[in-house]
Amino acid sequence: LSQNAFLAQIYHKPGVLTRRKPSQKELEDIEFGLPIARKLADMEIGQTLVVKNKTVIAVEAFEGTDKAIQRGCEFAKGGCVVIKVSRTNQDYRYDSPGIGPQTIKTLIEGGASVLALEAERVMVVEQEKVIKMSDEASLTVICI
């Protein structure tokens, strides 16, 4: 059985989860990066993309989400948008893409401004902590 069936409360519908809303420029970066992230995920390259000023800064590969975020934030010098998606044919019985407090810590340390998650397809574990940490750092978390 799919994990989604039992964990529906940690897969969010579209909307902003934090107090800070994305700027118009950040929304444009999300719009630019989302189709790229989906394509890369479907090619089984990675599920995380770092974008700034409509430029791809980093792509997740074998190293995993946190390392891709660290690398992207380092090159972007902060203020970047991080997009996390799932594959179109994601098998949720075995693998559920997700983020949690460690991801948020990595984003904050790197100076990212937005985390955009694919709505109802990327899980948020320890949600209250994720939102509290993000709000305290003025990091936007949005489900798209």
Q: Where do the protein language model's features map onto the residues?
A:
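Conserved mixed alpha/beta catalytic, RNA-binding, or beta-rich assembly cores of soluble enzyme
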Residues: 1-104, 108
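C-terminal binding/interaction regions
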Residues: 105-144
